[in-house]
């Protein structure tokens, strides 16, 4: 019988306790000692959490995900496999980041200065992506900092977001444009009259005014 190689065997989760709070963390995860991980959070195989990052309680960080220095994640966030969250990103509660999505941090990237010298940290002006409560970033989407993704917004898979996104917006394309609205359930809303929308999943009603949507 063929025996699986060591690399083919999934890395087990361990349950470290910090001040009596349990977490599920893969033994292959790379977590800086200065990072803070909330209770109930799961960190999977080959994930990396950098120095002074904060991950709230009950989050899930998928295989190969990356959380940069000083990044902040609220509670109940889900970061899927190979998603990259670069500093100084801020994710509020309940944010979803899909597989291989990227949150950038350099508006005008260059490897070298105009003198041909390799850039150092001192030459780098960091800008971040802020994602508000309940928003979702689809697989392989790119959020180009500095931008803010509004509450409960949805960014479709593969989209490239270069501008701020309003609450409840459904954004599609490159560059991403609003093609509709979504409710808190994530389901696209149905328009009932020129200014009102209903969620077919929950029955919640919304009103659009001057390009912004609010829950009634």
Task: Label every PLM stretch briefly.
Residues 4-7:
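Cationic, low-complexity basic patches in intrinsically disordered or flexible, solvent-exposed regions
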Residues 191-192, 207-210:
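Short, non-ligating residues that shape and space the ligands of small metal-coordination modules
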Residues 178-181, 197:
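Cys/His-enriched microdomains
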Residues 12-27, 32-33, 42-148:
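Flexible, glycine/small-residue-enriched loop-and-beta-strand segment within the central core
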């Amino acid at each position: 019988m063929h025996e699986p190689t060591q690399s083919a065997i999934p890395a087990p989760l361990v349950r470290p306790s910090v001040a009596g709070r349990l977490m599920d963390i893969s033994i292959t995860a790379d977590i800086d000692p200065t990072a803070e991980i909330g209770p109930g959070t799961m960190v999977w195989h080959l994930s990396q959490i950098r120095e002074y990052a904060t991950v709230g309680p009950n989050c899930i960080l998928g295989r190969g995900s990356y959380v940069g220095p000083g990044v902040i994640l609220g509670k109940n966030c889900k970061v899927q496999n190979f998603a990259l969250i670069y500093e100084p990103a801020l994710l509020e509660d309940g944010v979803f980041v899909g597989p291989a999505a990227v949150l950038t941090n350099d508006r005008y990237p260059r490897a070298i200065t105009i003198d041909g010298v390799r850039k150092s940290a001192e030459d780098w002006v960091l800008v971040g992506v802020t994602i508000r409560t309940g928003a979702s970033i689809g697989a392989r989407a790119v959020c180009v900092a500095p931008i803010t993704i509004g509450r409960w917004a949805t960014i479709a898979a593969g989209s490239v977001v270069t501008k701020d996104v309003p609450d409840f917006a459904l954004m599609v394309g490159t560059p991403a444009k609003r093609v509709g609205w979504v409710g808190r359930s994530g389901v696209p809303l149905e328009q009932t009259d020129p200014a009102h929308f209903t969620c077919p999943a929950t029955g919640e009603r919304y009103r659009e005014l001057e390009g912004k949507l609010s829950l009634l």
